[in-house]
């Protein structure tokens, strides 16, 4: 009986010891559970913050993607604009070269016209001298014609006198006839001289009119050449202004393109940081 009691006491002590150990383990387990709960709560809080940060980062990333797409579209548009400007500039340069060539041709034509004008001026002076000579010849011809008319009247008067003398003196017939023949010959010569002088005067008038018409035509050509030269010069000035304007616009577009490129580089750097 005592042995059973001792065994029971030993078992009771053992169970009590086991109970104490179990309580200690339970307390440790509860403490560990509490610590785990605190850690889980902290992890949940951290997870919420991480999810919130991730949401913000995704939102910012979407905004950056939109900005990048817009910037790429603007860059593409600017590239097209620059290409169009370069093509316009090339066409303007071609027009400028064409206008420069035309201006050179017009200048050459103007120089040639100036040379022709000087030649015509010299020729005009020569023609004026010839016209003065012709006028002098014409005056002389008119004087000769008047003199011929006077001589003709005188011959006619003398002829009448000869005819009267012929009627009155048959014995002087041979002498009178011979003189009459001489007078007729003189009259014929005078008539031919008058006709020659009239033809010379008509030709001189025709040449004078031809010279005047030629001078008028050349003067009109010179004025037309000067007008073309002035027009070409104005066209070149307008083209030069257009080229200057296009160059300024191209510089502005390049500056805008550089600014956008810098902004894109900065955006890429920020995205790389995330």
From Swiss-Prot:
Keywords: Allergen, Coiled coil, Repeat
Family annotation (InterPro entries): Tropomyosin
Record SUPFAM superfamilies: Tropomyosin
Chain intervals for the UniProt region annotation (Disordered): 1-30
Pfam families noted in UniProt: Tropomyosin
UniProt key word Aminoacyl-tRNA synthetase: no
Family to which this protein belongs: Belongs to the tropomyosin family.
Subunit text: Homodimer.
Record's function text: Tropomyosin, in association with the troponin complex, plays a central role in the calcium dependent regulation of muscle contraction.
Domain remark in the UniProt entry: The molecule is in a coiled coil structure that is formed by 2 polypeptide chains. The sequence exhibits a prominent seven-residues periodicity.
Protein name per Swiss-Prot or TrEMBL: Tropomyosin
């Amino acid at each position: 009986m005592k042995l059973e009691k001792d065994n029971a006491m030993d078992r009771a002590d053992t169970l009590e010891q086991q109970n104490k150990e179990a309580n200690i383990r339970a307390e440790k387990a509860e403490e560990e559970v509490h610590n785990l709960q605190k850690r889980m709560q902290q992890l949940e809080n951290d997870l919420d913050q991480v999810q919130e940060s991730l949401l913000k980062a995704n939102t910012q990333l979407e905004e950056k993607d939109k900005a990048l797409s817009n910037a790429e579209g603007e860059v593409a548009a600017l590239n097209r604009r620059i290409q169009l400007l370069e093509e316009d500039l090339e066409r303007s340069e071609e027009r400028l070269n064409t206008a420069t060539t035309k201006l050179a041709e017009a200048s050459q034509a103007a120089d040639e016209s100036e040379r022709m004008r000087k030649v015509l001026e010299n020729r005009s002076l020569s023609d004026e001298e010839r016209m003065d000579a012709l006028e002098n010849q014409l005056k002389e011809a008119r004087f000769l014609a008047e003199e011929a008319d006077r001589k003709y009247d005188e011959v006619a008067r003398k002829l009448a006198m000869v005819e009267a003398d012929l009627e009155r003196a048959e014995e002087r017939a041979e002498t009178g006839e011979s003189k009459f023949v001489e007078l007729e010959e003189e009259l014929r010569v005078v008539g031919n001289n008058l006709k020659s002088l009239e033809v010379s005067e008509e030709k001189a008038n025709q040449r004078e009119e031809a010279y005047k018409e030629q001078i008028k035509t050349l003067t009109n050509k010179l004025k037309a050449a000067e007008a073309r030269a002035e027009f070409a010069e104005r066209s070149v000035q307008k083209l030069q202004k257009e080229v200057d304007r296009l160059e300024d616009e191209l510089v502005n577009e390049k500056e805008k393109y550089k600014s956008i490129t810098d902004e894109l580089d900065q955006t890429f750097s920020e995205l790389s940081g995330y």
